[in-house]
Structures are given as C-alpha cells and as structure tokens.
A protein has these predicted regions:
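N-terminal pre-Walker A segment at the start of P-loop NTPase domains
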Residues: 1-18
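Short phosphate-coordinating micro-motif centered on Lys-Gly-acidic
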Residues: 2, 87-139
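Phosphate-binding P-loop
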Residues: 21-26
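Short hydrophobic/aromatic beta-strand immediately N-terminal to the Walker A/P-loop
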Residues: 28-30
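P-loop (Walker A) phosphate-binding loop of NTP-binding proteins
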Residues: 32-34
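Conserved lysine of the Walker
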Residues: 39
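Conserved nucleotide-sensing/catalytic segment adjacent to the nucleotide-binding pocket
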Residues: 52, 61, 65-108
Length: 139
C-alpha cells in the first residue's frame, strides 16, 4: 500500500492531480478521514487532473452529489456522504451512480452501506507534526 505526506493544501491538490492520471476513466476513489483532513482539497486536485476547474469543486455536503465536466470531456462525480446514515445512502442509488461513466470521488466513503469492488480507497489524516498523511487502504 502506498502513502504520501503533504505539507500544504497546494501539495495535497497536486497529489490529487497525479492520482487523477492513474485512475481509469470510470474509476472510483473512496476518501475517508476526519473533518478538515483534506478530502475536498484532494478532490479538487483530481478535478484539475481531469481538466476541470478545481475551484468548481466544493464540499457538496449540502447537495450530496455534484457532477463536473471538463473542457476535454472529463467527467467527475463528487459525492459527500457526511450527513447521511447508511439507510439514506442506500436510497440515493449510489450503486448505479458508481457503476456509471466518469471518475467518481466519494467523501466519507466509510458511510457506504456496500463494498465497491475495484475502487481505490484513501484515508486522510492530519499529522501532529503538521501536514497530512494520505494512505492507500484495502477496499
């Protein structure tokens, strides 16, 4: 399993852009971590790597799911499950969405009530020494 240390939002965003190039065109990235761990910043970097304006990617906590399209045809579906319980998450139809086209990034993925085979799972955490640790985990 891989892990990275980032020391700023800019480094976290840059890592997201690198990871975007590694994802399949219909890949799924599952992000877990505490509030303020950098999940949305990493998602902004993913967007940038897909040719989407990263400033368009905001924490979708209040709208739950947002879709973004890049100038080069890249598609990003960004979901935030923070305020949902597993029953509410199941009612959203996320299984179909995650199987659909485009790169999917799910924040608070630990709230998914089902496994996502083939997805890349990352756990983000603040470090006591500063910065963030992003660790790939078994999905």
């Amino acid at each position: 399993m891989r892990s990275w240390i980032t020391h700023s939002e800019a480094e976290t965003r840059a890592l997201g852009a690198v990871l975007a190039r590694e994802l399949a065109p219909d890949g799924v990235l599952l992000l877990s971590g505490d509030l303020g761990a950098g999940k949305t910043v990493l998602a902004q970097g993913i967007a940038e790597g897909l040719g989407i304006d990263p400033d368009e990617v905001q924490s979708p906590t209040f709208s739950l799911i947002r879709e973004h399209r890049g100038t080069g045809g890249g598609r990003l579906v960004h979901a935030d499950l923070y305020r949902l319980d597993p029953e509410e998450t199941a009612a959203l139809g996320l299984e179909e969405l995650l199987a659909g086209p485009g790169v999917k990034v799910v924040e608070w993925a630990e709230r998914l009530p089902f496994p996502v085979p083939g997805a890349t799972a990352l756990r983000l955490a603040r470090r006591s020494a500063g910065g963030r640790e992003i660790r790939e985990e078994t999905n």
